[in-house]
């Protein structure tokens, strides 16, 4: 049939990827990588598309770090096909999109059945509502993403619940030049870091740092952790 990758990786397929990634609580690596793949196919895909198609999607999978279970349990519960079946029933994905099986999404999902389990949730009773990636815009970066499926209610209340400016926050920027600087200085009292600060590591993106590695798990300074503040923006 001479089916080529470009026949499968269409804009509709990328839309399906965005919706499915949002529903399973995928890594923040997903948006930049999927956008880069689309670019190689001359398909314009941006964070605006993630915001449009994914932000309102609920979290359907009870997996760590957003939930309790591990990947093996997700596989045994039916995995991604069962999640896509739930999304398909709600008309959230393009059922007519061609796939690597040579069949459409609808064909692939025709015989998929969801069994009752505590790992894959029904769309109407998800782990969390509106759990896709929140696209952030700021005066010191063009765009960034926040994985809402793992954002705690405490964090949301503190930073994203201003009655006049919902889903916005203003904070003092604490800037570190690389992971070593962060580790050496995060507990420096002269920085005067409080709960109204945002932590930034400069120069560790795809251009400034080899491979755009995940170089540090940024936590607040110890004195905030002792107060029960487990995360800063």
What is each residue range found by the language model?
Residues 1-233:
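Catalytic or ion-coupling anion/metal-binding cores of large enzyme and transporter domains
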């Amino acid at each position: 049939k001479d089916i080529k990758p470009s026949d499968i990786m269409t804009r509709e397929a990328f839309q399906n990827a965005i919706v499915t990634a949002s529903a399973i609580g995928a890594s923040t690596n997903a948006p930049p990588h999927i956008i880069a793949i689309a670019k190689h196919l001359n398909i314009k895909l941006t964070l605006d598309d993630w915001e449009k198609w994914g932000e309102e999607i609920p979290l359907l999978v009870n997996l760590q770090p957003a939930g309790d279970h591990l990947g093996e349990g997700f596989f045994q519960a039916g995995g991604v096909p069962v999640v896509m079946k739930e999304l398909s029933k709600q008309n959230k994905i393009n059922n007519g999109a061609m796939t690597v099986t040579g069949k459409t999404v609808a064909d692939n999902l025709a015989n998929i059945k969801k069994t009752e389990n505590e790992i894959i949730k029904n769309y109407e009773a998800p782990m969390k509502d509106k759990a896709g990636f929140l696209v952030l815009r700021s005066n010191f970066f063009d765009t960034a993403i926040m994985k809402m499926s793992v954002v705690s209610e405490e964090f949301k209340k503190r930073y994203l619940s201003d009655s006049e400016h919902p889903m916005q926050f203003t904070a003092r920027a604490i800037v570190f030049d690389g992971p070593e600087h962060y580790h050496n200085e995060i507990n420096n009292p002269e920085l005067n870091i409080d709960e109204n600060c945002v932590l930034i590591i400069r120069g560790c993106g795809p251009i400034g740092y080899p491979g755009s590695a995940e170089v540090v798990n940024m936590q607040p300074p110890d004195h905030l952790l002792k107060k029960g503040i487990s995360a800063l923006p």
